[in-house]
């Protein structure tokens, strides 16, 4: 009947619409749905669409005051996951009007806000989002992007080199600045505050900023290269975060840093706007991501968090190494690395990309490879990530037997050797070790590094794997 009829009704009657043709303004989502036993996949998919858009558990008379057909999310396709029992990919289309312009916060609150605790589902994972051009255009995106960053730094044709200062907690500001200076002096482009360095009793932020700025300017003067240190502006309040970013700008340093998941998307977007307006680069760390993205059947895949960061704004983001100590399977990692860097990315299920994404010239983000990597990984990293990346060696620089500066020299020599060989047409995948060995002949620092790390590998199976 057309009239209002109270009572509970099945979601799929309203929200499962296999005949629906998606619009180019729709936000499309791919969910991995694991229904409770006895719940049909269509009902589970429809429930996800309903609970993340206009639905509630019962019919309400106020539904008659609006056009549900115009505003409801629709589950338009369901496919079983190969090799998994009782797992399905449910595709949901959301009308653009459901979302506030320029707000990643609102987008996530809508799409993943409530539905993950839903009783009819055993587990739920957001695998991918297609952001329509009309929504992309409401975001500023990265403060500067890859090309502008290269122009600011005057560094071309190679990956950039970084190093996280260790021990991450406990150094005084003066000693911390000294470690920064030695790394930059030795040949690195950047050094980095660890993600949990904010403003603690043993080192307050203002002291750290001051000594790091001194290290930057001294090493710049001595090397003739532009240097940077990611000054972590993450703080307990947005106001305090902005205060730190403003102080960094007053010191004249090139780059600040933010933990975008723990700090939150609202704070991150504010900081990104400030950075563009004031010429600061913005380095993004993904602390807390594994709590959200590590389980294969529940949570949010990192490729979605990466897309969200490109919208919210950041010039660098940590994105796994493929070869080090932290998670990252090659094809999947390269899938979201391309989503960060490229302007147009075709749907490619072999790399976990569920939708074609057009960024309409939104600036790109440099992926940062960091975590358990050292000189022997350099050929693989250069091969996998290409020029537009930041390779970050923490222990792989500071663990050098002769100290930080020689550790930095070793990494820079290894990188230059790999880039030179690649440009000469050599195959880094097969000749990588040979290229590094040749370079050790004219770099005692590299030879010493090769000796220390020759045996270390972190061999565990990746958790994040593709479906068969």
Curated annotation (Swiss-Prot):
Positions carrying N6-carboxylysine: 192
Pfam family, one: RuBisCO_large_N
Residues with the N6,N6,N6-trimethyllysine modification: 5
Record function comment: RuBisCO catalyzes two reactions: the carboxylation of D-ribulose 1,5-bisphosphate, the primary event in carbon dioxide fixation, as well as the oxidative fragmentation of the pentose substrate in the photorespiration process. Both reactions occur simultaneously and in competition at the same active site.
PTM comment, free text: The disulfide bond which can form in the large chain dimeric partners within the hexadecamer appears to be associated with oxidative stress and protein turnover.
Key words, A-Z: Calvin cycle, Carbon dioxide fixation, Chloroplast, Disulfide bond, Lyase, Magnesium, Metal-binding, Methylation, Monooxygenase, Oxidoreductase, Photorespiration, Photosynthesis, Plastid
Official protein name in the record: Ribulose bisphosphate carboxylase large chain
Residues the UniProt record annotates as site (Transition state stabilizer): 325
Additional remark text: The basic functional RuBisCO is composed of a large chain homodimer in a 'head-to-tail' conformation. In form I RuBisCO this homodimer is arranged in a barrel-like tetramer with the small subunits forming a tetrameric 'cap' on each end of the 'barrel'.
Organism: Anthospermum herbaceum
